[in-house]
């Protein structure tokens, strides 16, 4: 008859035997996983076909999930070594992108469907200036009449009533026509005189040194008339402003001697 100590040892060995066998079997299964550290370090290719096993243990479930990921088309070795949750994230991202693209397409279609109709802009009417209905036609002067009027204007810019009546009858024109022509000619002479004075002033300022100015305003009518040989307004100056004589004279010296 065996002693109690031997029975305990046999009992303990019987209990430890199945437990040790289960641990060794678990280690073998864990080491055979394709995403374990040993498999990654050894660079061994995972088996293409895995034997079917019962879905009882967690290790078998992980192995089956990994085999499903490997058998899916479009997934390479990166998906084979990735955890099972990565596939779910990939499907979620793809579904979100498809929903966003569908929403954008529908929004574009709705925007094109409800676009406002094009507006037809009518061209703005250009309003032309209308002349008076009772406006008299422009008098066509002949060449001989224009030459006579120009000679008379050079002699005298303002005509008296008697002179205008006599001059208009000699040209076969009315007094009103002669009067209007003289008014227009005086306005033209004034514009020409102002342009000549402006050119003269610009030329004088260009020749003067910095900080020096003319002792009188060149645009005043009295001083401007002194620059001309006669009182005729549209004559060119007999002597333009000489730079040497102007520099030699003092500032307060006038230029009446130039004429």
UniProtKB/Swiss-Prot annotation:
<keyword id="KW-0892">Osteogenesis</keyword>
<dbReference type="GO" id="GO:0000977">
    <property type="term" value="F:RNA polymerase II transcription regulatory region sequence-specific DNA binding"/>
</dbReference>
<keyword id="KW-0804">Transcription</keyword>
<dbReference type="Pfam" id="PF00046">
    <property type="entry name" value="Homeodomain"/>
</dbReference>
<dbReference type="InterPro" id="IPR020479">
    <property type="entry name" value="HD_metazoa"/>
</dbReference>
<dbReference type="InterPro" id="IPR001356">
    <property type="entry name" value="HD"/>
</dbReference>
<feature type="compositionally biased region" description="Basic and acidic residues">
    <location>
        <begin position="1"/>
        <end position="11"/>
    </location>
</feature>
<keyword id="KW-0217">Developmental protein</keyword>
<dbReference type="InterPro" id="IPR050674">
    <property type="entry name" value="Msh_Homeobox_Regulators"/>
</dbReference>
<keyword id="KW-0805">Transcription regulation</keyword>
<keyword id="KW-0238">DNA-binding</keyword>
<feature type="region of interest" description="Disordered">
    <location>
        <begin position="47"/>
        <end position="124"/>
    </location>
</feature>
<dbReference type="GO" id="GO:0000981">
    <property type="term" value="F:DNA-binding transcription factor activity, RNA polymerase II-specific"/>
</dbReference>
<feature type="DNA-binding region" description="Homeobox">
    <location>
        <begin position="134"/>
        <end position="193"/>
    </location>
</feature>
<dbReference type="GO" id="GO:0005634">
    <property type="term" value="C:nucleus"/>
</dbReference>
<protein>
    <recommendedName>
        <fullName>Homeobox protein MSX-2</fullName>
    </recommendedName>
</protein>
<comment type="similarity">
    <text>Belongs to the Msh homeobox family.</text>
</comment>
<dbReference type="InterPro" id="IPR017970">
    <property type="entry name" value="Homeobox_CS"/>
</dbReference>
<dbReference type="GO" id="GO:0048598">
    <property type="term" value="P:embryonic morphogenesis"/>
</dbReference>
<feature type="region of interest" description="Disordered">
    <location>
        <begin position="1"/>
        <end position="29"/>
    </location>
</feature>
<comment type="function">
    <text>Acts as a transcriptional regulator in bone development. Probable morphogenetic role. Binds to DNA.</text>
</comment>
<keyword id="KW-0539">Nucleus</keyword>
<feature type="compositionally biased region" description="Polar residues">
    <location>
        <begin position="90"/>
        <end position="108"/>
    </location>
</feature>
<dbReference type="GO" id="GO:0001503">
    <property type="term" value="P:ossification"/>
</dbReference>
<keyword id="KW-0371">Homeobox</keyword>
<comment type="subunit">
    <text>Interacts with MINT, with XRCC6 (Ku70) and XRCC5 (Ku80).</text>
</comment>
<dbReference type="InterPro" id="IPR009057">
    <property type="entry name" value="Homeodomain-like_sf"/>
</dbReference>
């Amino acid at each position: 008859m065996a002693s109690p100590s031997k029975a305990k040892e046999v009992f303990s060995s019987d209990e430890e035997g199945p437990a040790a066998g289960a641990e060794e079997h678990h280690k073998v299964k864990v080491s055979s996983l394709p995403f374990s550290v040993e498999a990654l370090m050894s660079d061994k290719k995972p088996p293409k076909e895995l034997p079917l096993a019962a879905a009882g243990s967690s290790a078998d479930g992980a192995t089956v999930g990994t085999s499903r990921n490997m058998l899916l088309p479009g997934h390479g070795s990166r998906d084979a070594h990735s955890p099972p949750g990565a596939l779910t994230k990939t499907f979620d991202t793809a579904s979100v992108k498809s929903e966003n693209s569908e929403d954008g397409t529908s929004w574009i279609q709705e925007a094109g469907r409800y676009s406002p109709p094009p507006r037809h802009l009518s061209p703005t009417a250009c309003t032309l200036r209308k002349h008076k209905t009772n406006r008299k036609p422009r008098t066509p002067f002949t060449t001989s009449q224009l030459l006579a009027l120009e000679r008379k204007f050079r002699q005298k810019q303002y005509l008296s009533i008697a002179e205008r009546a006599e001059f208009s009858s000699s040209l076969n024109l009315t007094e009103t026509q002669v009067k209007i022509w003289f008014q227009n000619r005086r306005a033209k002479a004034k514009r020409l005189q102002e342009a000549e004075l402006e050119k003269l002033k610009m030329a004088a300022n260009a020749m003067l040194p910095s900080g020096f100015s003319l002792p009188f305003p060149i645009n005043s009518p009295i001083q401007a008339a002194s620059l001309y040989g006669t009182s005729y307004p549209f004559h060119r100056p007999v002597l333009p402003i000489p730079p040497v004589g102007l520099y030699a004279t003092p500032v307060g010296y006038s230029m009446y001697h130039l004429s």
